[in-house]
Amino acid sequence: NNIEALYRCIEKIIRCAKKLGKLVVATGDVHNINREDRLYREIIVNQNVPGKGRHVLARYLSGSKKACKNLDNINKVINICEEQEVKTDNVLNKVLKYIYVLNRIKKIPITASNISSIYSVSKNSQDEEIFRGKDGDAEKLKAISTVLRKLNVANVVKEKDGIYELNGNYIESEMPVPGHIPNQFFRTTKEMKEEFEFLNDQELIKEIVVTNPNKIIDMLEEIEVVEYPDKPYSPIIPNSQETTINMVFEKAHSMYGDPLPRNIEERIAQEFYGDNILDLVKEKLKIDHPRLSDERLDEEFPSLLHEIIISGYDAVVDIMADKLKRESEMALDDKKVREDAKAALGGIIGGGFDVIYLIAQKLVKHSNDDGYLVGSRGSVGSSFVASMMGITECNGLPAHYYCPKCHYSEFNNEKGEPYSIEYASGFDLPNKNCPECKTLMIHEGNDMPFATFLGFNADKVPDIDLNFSGDNQASAHEYTKVLFGTDNVYRAGTIGTVADKTAFGYVQGFFEERLYDQLKIEAESYGLTVTGKDELKKKGVIKSFVRIPEVERIAVGCTGVKRTTGQHPGGIVVVPGYKDVWDFTPFQYPADDPTSAWRTTHFDYHAIDADLLKLDILGHDDPTVLRMLQDLSGLDVTKIDLGDLDTMKIFTGPEILGVDRYKLRGTVDKDGRKYCPTGTLGVPEFGTNFLLGMLEETKPTTFAELIKISGLSHGTDVWLGNARDLCTPNSEGKIEVPFKNVIGCRDDIMVNLIAWGMKPVKAFKIMEFVRKGKASKEPAAWAEHVKTMKEAGIPEWYIESCRKIKYMFPKAHATAYVTSAFRIAWFKVHHPIWYYCAYLSIRRDQFDIESMIKGADAIRAKIDEIDEKGSAASNKEIDTRETLCICLEMCERGFYFKNIDVEKSDGKKFVITDDEKGLIIPFRALDGLGDNVALAIVKARKEGPFISQEDLSTRGKVNTSAMEKLKALGCLDNMSESNQLSLF
């Protein structure tokens, strides 16, 4: 209703600013590219903003703490802004912003009456009342005070102790108007000019829309907001290269002796400096000893290679520089040659990644010193150097033996053939005594090329991901502050976006809200009261009137929109000491709390991952379970035999556990009978229904096959419709390819192709192409690879299997998972009560105490009851079923559960009974009790025994509902109700 007054205000501001020599620029506050996108923004804001849809500016102007907790900082920014901006719409907000600058108004929601009242009292005011004059705060304060007085007279605001607040009574009768989201789409120049047609001055319009914005652009300095260097800026650790070299050779010599076997010496050299290092040293050897025969040169090569490697980085650079000088036809500057030589080197040290390895080593050692194992993720396990530094337990060498006493090692059998031809994993090698000292040798190696981690010439940036115990993760995070300093480490920021299903709910909710508002207005016009929206939805009165296809169409526009910011669960970004965090990103505090222990990068970490090192210090249950098993047993879990035959048997059936598979629950056989085909329930990576099916079909008997199964289960289009069809009987009962030969992990492709005679570089390129699923995306390139494979004699079934693959799991990751799983499975077979205690304490959250304490039959009945519900079963019931399947197995093995004991139960963990045949259920297992109350009970019990139910409730902070559940279970039968004693 006041649009004309609004136009006059804008015109006054513009002309006043021009007289004062101010640069007036028309800007668009753009949130959308297209005009139609406004609906999407309105839907998103409607869901995410407290107050149902109030724009963030409206929340800021009203002093809402939800808008921003740094209002003073925003006000400072407003005050130092030199240019006067003319918004293309919603100019009222600009005026209100000016009023709020001096913090004189505590609360001004944007409503219809506010707009009308403010402009009705300000349209005839003097220019200085709207425009912030050049004479500073005195004039602005005078102008604002005048406006506030008029608002007060108009009953829009009220004054108390010098603070102006919105008059609540004035607002109660107001109905917020729809359309609270401004039109913030990206306007064309023509559309921008049309917005200012009310000025009736084409020259002025052109000036503020075209000329002045260009002047602003010309004033701006061109900057690179986010740098994109060749590799991340890493911290500096003094003597890192020397430390890395010494650490690796010290460990290698302790295992394989000194001098090292040639293949190990070469592997270390290639990982340190890239594949070219071998040819470089051979060339130097020939030049230095031109008269030696090829046979003699070959004999001398290992010792010279070792001498050069331990001499350090500079020695290798010198050799490369000499090579470049020899190959150049012109004289080269020494400084330039050394720079080129450094650039030509790859690998861990040659590429400058030794610091990253050392950091990972320090983090792992810190956790190990605290008593926790650390699992490796990704392909870092294929790095033999990482293995020697203790970063990973995986050994990437081919299958082999080594003697722990005299350090003899053996990679070939009596025929001179590599063990890796028959054994894909060294853990499957039969036991063998050392031929030198008769000591039982250790079998090792899982045949993983280093190229899968750092590329063929070790030219990729290493990404070392580690799985720490959830109990020790926070300690590992804090340790980075010790390593680098508090001001140099930040939690990696993330941006959460709207998922497709969430967007669908947003859209439906938006239209339901709109329908409810219309219904409410209509009802109130007749003096009727409308009940709450949720109640009307239940009755079917309120539901989206928009057709599902239209809802889906609109939801697409909302999908992927920024919803919130957060932090990576384990990502720590390291800013080196020679750089400043501001060179890369602002930072923020979680929940805007400056006292938070950690600060978070404001930019999503993906935006700066090329600039800064990100440490992935992730939490995982396996190290926690293994630590608890180690504490319970007193055994060193790293000494467990990964070739234990009894443990291997649980992957083909539960009989080794002493139970009948048809008394267990897991899945259903072809005749509809419930059973469990394996003994792997509760074994990480091997206990899900999908894995139970895979295990039943593949019947693995070796560690290598377990690794292959892990790779197959984590890949995409690798098992179903691919390997499964090759290794399981067809309609004629025939198997096309033995299971051990199918492709399971990405490393298998490179190893297999090399074994078939293909050059390593070609094999690597095909592996990279296949594992990324490019065969269907790049048919021309795939045709060339097919030609290469056919020329090498690769079977058709293998080529076709490669074609189908969309994603492949790294073998090192699978090996690390299977290693942890096998150790846990070993306890399940040989020390079951410790296993069940650790598993249920750490990995399960949902329990059914009533059936657990009654034994196997009651547990089986409860599982069947949940199964009968089918898809109607809740997530909680499904989780409970998983727990009960393990509990059933435990009871069938002759063990039992003891009810919650007020005097003996732990807060969170199961406790082994004195006869070591049962487990006492912890307090947290009681539905609705919660960890905090469970721990409070234990803490209060340590201070003194509970003398009554009243005492338990009071000191243990147990609510009435939980007390009733404890009574129903019979946990309180031996306790009086009150603290008072009865004399009668």
Predicted regions span which residues?
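Acidic, Ser/Thr-rich peripheral helices and adjacent loops at domain boundaries
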Residues: 44-56
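Short amphipathic alpha-helical interface segments
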Residues: 82-131
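Noncatalytic, beta-rich nucleic-acid-contacting surfaces in large DNA/RNA-processing enzymes
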Residues: 27, 43-46, 64-81, 88, ...
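Conserved, mostly hydrophobic/aromatic
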Residues: 29, 213
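Active-site microenvironment for binding and transforming phosphate-containing groups
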Residues: 206
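Histidine/acidic-residue-rich catalytic or RNA/ligand-binding cores of hydrolases
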Residues: 34-45
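Charge-enriched amphipathic alpha-helical scaffolds
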Residues: 119, 123-126, 132-158, 961-962, ...
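Histidine/acidic residue-rich metal-binding segments in metalloenzymes
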Residues: 4-23
